[in-house]
């Protein structure tokens, strides 16, 4: 049984120059989506039975940076943030993911503060990307600049 006092979330980024990146290029490793990562974090929060454990998501590479708190007292709030994101229409989730990876927003609520030019830039990336996996590759490449 593991009972940590502190859990810090760090989203995986596959960076050029690493063995994992080489595996990615050869197809031995495939990227998972931000939504899959969020679901994994949700499962961690939901299944944790520890008392007093502090969970933080305090880095720009984490999609939902505001998911932080004590697992015993803030669990429902953190799950609410995650469920709010997962409940967004797919297009809005993709736009938020791109805006976040472009360092333009921190939370989905920040999307309403974007300029029309920013929104057009995001839409251009979204609509000119061939498929969802190609989008994950673009997002991973954007995140490389943060580490």
Please provide the spans of the model-predicted regions:
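Auxiliary Fe-S-binding modules of radical SAM enzymes
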Residues: 3-8, 12-147
């Amino acid at each position: 049984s593991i009972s940590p006092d502190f859990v810090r979330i760090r989203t995986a980024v596959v960076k050029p120059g690493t063995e994992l990146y080489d595996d990615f290029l050869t197809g031995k490793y495939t990227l998972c989506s931000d939504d899959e990562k969020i679901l994994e974090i949700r499962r961690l929060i939901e299944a944790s039975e520890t008392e007093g454990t502090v969970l933080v998501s305090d880095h720009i590479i984490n999609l939902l940076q505001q998911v932080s708190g004590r697992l015993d007292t803030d669990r429902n709030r953190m799950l609410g943030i995650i469920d709010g994101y997962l409940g967004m229409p797919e297009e809005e989730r993709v736009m938020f993911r791109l805006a976040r990876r472009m360092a333009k927003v921190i939370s989905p609520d920040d999307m309403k503060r974007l300029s029309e030019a920013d929104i057009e830039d995001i839409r251009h990336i979204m609509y000119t990307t061939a498929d969802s996996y190609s989008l994950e590759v673009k997002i991973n490449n954007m995140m490389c600049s943060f580490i």
